[in-house]
From Swiss-Prot:
Amino acids binding Zn(2+): H120, H124, H130
GO BP field: rRNA processing
Name under which the protein is recorded: Endoribonuclease YbeY
InterPro entries: MetalPrtase_cat_dom_sf_prd, YbeY
Family annotation (Pfam families): YbeY
Family per similarity comment: Belongs to the endoribonuclease YbeY family.
SUPFAM superfamilies documented for this protein: Metalloproteases ('zincins'), catalytic domain
Cofactor binding, note field: Binds 1 zinc ion.
Protein's organism: Leptospira biflexa serovar Patoc (strain Patoc 1 / ATCC 23582 / Paris)
Listed cofactors: Zn(2+)
Subcellular location: Cytoplasm
Length: 154
């Protein structure tokens, strides 16, 4: 069964909308979520926030007690056994300022870096974790590659 999907995008700085457009983000999230979603779900909801470094630092301090900016944060609400077949997956927050800096440092495009961060955040919302042990890190990396292949398939 293919779940119905709701993806919500929110910007705190409209200048980012000229580089990352909402419609492709939503359609690419739908590809990723359909790939990752368990069969029993009837619907799945995800919120994506694109923010500047200042707001990211505020969110990071408020939600994690770390008063610094970062590239991506995930706040999962996912449960493997929800009481009903409707699931609010969680939130992904991406600092577009940090995303731009990292893209330049790494030497690839902003869109590539944006989707790398988005996929990373979505996977965390599904319970993947690269910090527990090497095996989990390798699995998460494999899933990141598979999701990015879906996004960038020609």
């Amino acid at each position: 069964m293919n779940p119905s999907l709701s993806v919500f995008t929110h910007w705190n700085d409209e200048s980012n909308q000229s580089e990352i457009f909402s419609d492709p983000v939503i359609s690419n999230c739908e590809k990723i979520l359909r790939f990752l979603a368990p069969e029993f779900l009837h619907s799945l909801e995800l919120s994506i926030y694109l923010v500047n470094d200042s707001l990211m630092a505020e969110i990071n301090e408020e939600r994690r007690g770390k008063p610094a900016t970062t590239d991506v944060l995930s706040f999962p609400l996912y449960s493997e056994h929800p009481p009903i077949p409707v699931q609010i997956l969680g939130e992904v927050v991406i600092s577009m300022e940090t995303c731009k800096k990292q893209a330049m440092e790494i030497g690839h495009g902003l869109v590539d870096e944006f989707y790398r961060l988005l996929v990373h955040g979505i996977l965390h919302n599904f319970g993947y974790d690269h910090e527990t042990n090497e095996e989990d890190a390798l699995l998460m990396r494999k899933m990141e590659d598979e999701c990015l292949d879906l996004v960038f398939a020609t």
